[in-house]
Every structure is written in structure tokens, then in C-alpha cells.
Amino acid sequence: MKIIILGAGQVGGTLAEHLADEQNDITVVDERAATLKRLQERLDIRTVLGNGAHPSALLNAGAEDADMLIAVTDSDEINMLACSVAFTLYRTPTKISRVRSADYLAKHQALFESGSIPVDVIIGPEQLVTKN
């Protein structure tokens, strides 16, 4: 499976490590060159330096034939916009976004339910913790 991961922090790096072990074709996009270099030195993955919400970065990452986009940057807005760009321009079939703000998750869930923001799976870590 061809998977693009946006964000090379702790979550993105861990995802890349686990998914690369499962023989997936992984590309990680991030704006921090040193972080990408460290990931690439220890994993068999591709990296792209850039903003994951920019169409050119997604294209360089292979979005035109990617099976999945996982957006786990530290910005909800970049994550949601990246999913929208990937769907609109490249028809990426599966889009997963980390969304941390309760304002998006609790008060304005209709944004996702209506398809206005094309996210197939929302990861809301703070919401999960507070619900349990």
C-alpha cells in the first residue's frame, strides 16, 4: 500500500516505523529537514521536505497514486486542509487526520459529516482520553 504521512514528529515517526515494517511504500512529509534525515537514516522510506498542505509537496510525495494520506502534523488546520487538497486534486481514497481541537470535534462535527472537509477517519487523542 502506498501511504503518505504528514508530520515527522513522534506520532508520524512511529507510524512510519510500524507501517514500513509491514512492507508498505511510505513517504513522510515535514518541514524539518533534520527530522526527516534522522527518519530516513533508520527506516526504508522516502521523505519530502515541505508543507503537507501544499499541492506541490503532496505531488512530490506521490499523492497522484497514493492509497492513503495520514495527516498528523501539530496543526489541525494543516491536517484538514491537506486531506481536502489530496482528495480534490489527487482523489486520494483514504484520508486520516489528527484533529485535537474540541471546537472542531464537538461543536462543529457537521464539517466532517457533510463531506465539506473530506476526512474519512478522525484521530482525536484528547477527545478519546476525556471520554474514558
Question: Where do the PLM segments sit?
Answer:
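Cytosolic regulatory regions of ion transport systems
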Residues: 1-132
